[in-house]
Amino acid sequence: MGTDIGDLLQKRKIELSDLTNQVVAIDAFNTLHQFLSIIRQRDGNPLVNSRGKVTSHLSGLLYRTASLIEVGIKPVFIFDGKPPDLKSETLNRRKEVRESSLEKWENAKVEGDLEAAYKYAQASSKVDQEIVEDSKYLLSIMGIPWIQAPCEGEAQAAHMVLKKDADYVASQDYDSFLFGAPTVIRNLAVTGKRKLPGKHVYVDVELELIELEETLGVLGINREQLIDIAICVGTDFNKGLEKVGPKTALKLIKKHGDIHAVLREKGVEIKELDRIRELFTHPDVTDDYEIKWGKPDSEKLIKFLCKENDFSVDRVKKAVERLKVVSRGRQQTLDQWF
């Protein structure tokens, strides 16, 4: 997903406690996809209720969000709206990958290859409309604000940080910087150990802070040039130039100044180039939103999670109590939220 410019960015390790009392605009689609990919059984099957309905995303939202609130982080989730028509090719390609992965997952389970089954199961994850609606409802009864973006969620989150309605964007994708986000947190949804694909090697997944101005200063470019680099590499709206990775793209843009000059030099074109640039420099966003945190509704949480989705009553009650303890223990701070 997004553009592959991560190797160019200046990343700094931080702790959850560094985000205390900070408003974090979370890319909801990205986060839900992480939960659906990671919260699975050994053979790749997701968590489901007694009716076979997937609940991995609900588990992730409840327990991870509770952990964030417990350390004083103020989360607000941003949901994608209608995608730009230039994204249709990328969306079709993702659909093909999901369908292929689903078939490979089933074959791996039959063959008893649990490692392959888990890998392909992760790649088959899909955030559908039912998952989105259930997630919005759960956040509402948890007292967590969410915002419906008119188009790209990352663009809306970046807009909110630029307006100083939020302090950080949280997303795994790097598109946030192309939309102008000054500060982005990665790995907020999932930390700990992660197995590298196809290897018996585990790496630590830690919180990362990336600041746009720091990266631009180190690279010696401006935001428009970063957008041009991303377009050279490839974005959700276009295929990249052949055999051009982020480091080569950086050299090309610094040498020629902008992507138009690069394309002239190479004798190639990128269709709808100006429209692609416009999607990043002037994205479709809204100011029609309210960020307000509320108190968790214990009865509705128990009904929705335990009675309707077969969650453990004890675990849900403990999560609710954690939220209530925070509410009682930090009342002065929380009064500013509500």
Curated annotation (Swiss-Prot):
EC number: 3.1.-.-
Family: Belongs to the XPG/RAD2 endonuclease family. FEN1 subfamily.
InterPro entries: 5-3_exonuclease_C_sf (IPR036279), Flap_endonuc (IPR023426), Flap_endonuc_arc (IPR019973), HhH2 (IPR008918), PIN-like_dom_sf (IPR029060), XPG-I_dom (IPR006086), XPG/Rad2 (IPR006084), XPG_CS (IPR019974)
Region entry Interaction with PCNA, spans: 330-338
Protein name: Flap endonuclease 1
Catalytic class of the enzyme: hydrolase
Presence of keyword Nuclease: yes
UniProt GO MF annotations: 5'-3' exonuclease activity; 5'-flap endonuclease activity; DNA binding; magnesium ion binding
N-domain: annotated span: 1-98
Pfam families, sorted: XPG_I, XPG_N
Region (I-domain): 116-257
Gene Ontology biological process terms in this record: DNA repair; DNA replication, removal of RNA primer
Cofactor requirement: Mg(2+)
Its job: Structure-specific nuclease with 5'-flap endonuclease and 5'-3' exonuclease activities involved in DNA replication and repair. During DNA replication, cleaves the 5'-overhanging flap structure that is generated by displacement synthesis when DNA polymerase encounters the 5'-end of a downstream Okazaki fragment. Binds the unpaired 3'-DNA end and kinks the DNA to facilitate 5' cleavage specificity. Cleaves one nucleotide into the double-stranded DNA from the junction in flap DNA, leaving a nick for ligation. Also involved in the base excision repair (BER) pathway.
Key words of the record: DNA damage, DNA repair, DNA replication, Endonuclease, Exonuclease, Hydrolase, Magnesium, Metal-binding, Nuclease
